[in-house]
Design a protein with these regions (language model features):
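Catalytic core of pol beta-like nucleotidyltransferases
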Residues: 1-26, 32-38, 47-93
Length: 93
């Protein structure tokens, strides 16, 4: 496993999401708000993903020490979480 740069990691995630037909990819959490630490995981929200389990499996193939969390925006029921994603999320595509 490697300690790749965040930009490189986002590039890998972007390609995998596009391959899986994700309509929109957003960076959320501490990396989106600029509060990430050396040990922070990296969080994404996806919109328009038909098979979230396949996407998660494909993302597990990325060789990184950082944990990657994916949230399916379309299935989130918590309105406060949705508001936070809408307010603080950084759209990748």
């Amino acid at each position: 496993m490697s300690t790749m740069s965040i930009d490189t990691l986002i590039g890998h995630v972007t390609r995998i999401c596009q391959k899986n037909g994700v309509a929109h990819l957003l960076l959320i959490g501490s990396f989106a708000t600029g509060t990430a630490r050396k040990t922070s995981d990296i969080d994404f929200a996806v919109k328009g993903c038909k098979d979230i389990l396949k996407l998660e499996e494909d993302l597990e193939e990325i060789e990184t020490l950082r944990k990657i969390d994916i949230f399916d925006y379309d299935s989130i029921k918590n309105k406060y979480l949705l508001e936070n994603i809408d307010k603080c999320g950084k759209q990748i595509y």
